[in-house]
Amino acid sequence: LTTADPITFRKTLNSLSNAGIENVAFEASSHGLFQRRLGDVKVKSAAFTSFSQDHLEYHQTMDGYLQAKLILFTENLIDGEEAVINSEIMFFDFIRSFLLEKNIPFCTVGNNGDVKIKRNKQSLEGQSICLEYKGKKYEFETNIIGSFQAINLLIAAKLVSNLGVEFDQIIEKLPEIEAVPGRLQRITSAENEYQVFVDYAHTPDALEKSLQELKKLKKKPGNLYVVFGCGGDRDTLKRPIMGKIASEIADKVIITDDNPRTEDPRKIRGQIAEAAVEAEEIADRKSAIIDTIAKLRKDDILLIAGKGHEDYQIIGKERFKFSDIEIARKAVQKV
């Protein structure tokens, strides 16, 4: 769970306050919002970073999922304070209309946002970004890879500016920010002939974005590989969708186990494979990662998707120590 119950959450905030912490950033999960786990906590600013098919085993419909997320802005955002919205996300027009109807001030971030990304030059080393905000142009470089991560970075910058920090000062500091572990994290170095990335992408939208970003960076005649699975006891509808996305964008698809939990992992892999043309199945995730890395050649790129920063794998009701990042690092060193 990413959002604690109201009492625990309040205790945590009180402890941070007693320790002299004046500003806190936290994730408000859709489950937590729907169950009112934030209680009466009010926030100075709130952001809507992404929205795509996920958690339908709980929310049942996309509309139910969206309405749960919007609770943050109607119940927990201080009246008159600003929401920050990713202008590139699914249902943006609906979200925009909703905020206008509720008289909630908002700022948009994206290719056509109030914080407007004018140019974004990508490389395996990071990206160079040119943006415009309130008539002023800014440029900076970051080692964080992926245009969608550039939007997240600028959303975070706008949230901080809403706390009273000058936007110019924030932009100056952005090059110092390191990539979040497991978010298009590069395992290899520039010296490697091939490249390996680990990403948390576990939804159709996230998988598509990560694969598209890496496809743009791939040099010919290299191939784009993807190793991924889907979690058990979770949304089953997304499995064939993710299989289709993987097979349409990647050159080589390897279906493996994610966190099967109490579901039959063969069934999960089969549902993904329904729409994944010519995909290979390797049930054991560690073997799938190691075997695929051993096959990589010059200019190939591998995306290991689904678990990202996680340091465990759930099989049945047991949690085992497991890290895509560590396994990939060791495999790269051995090749």
List where the protein language model places each region.
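Short glycine-rich, flexible loops that bind phosphorylated cofactors or substrates
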Residues: G32-L33, H55, F92, T262, ...
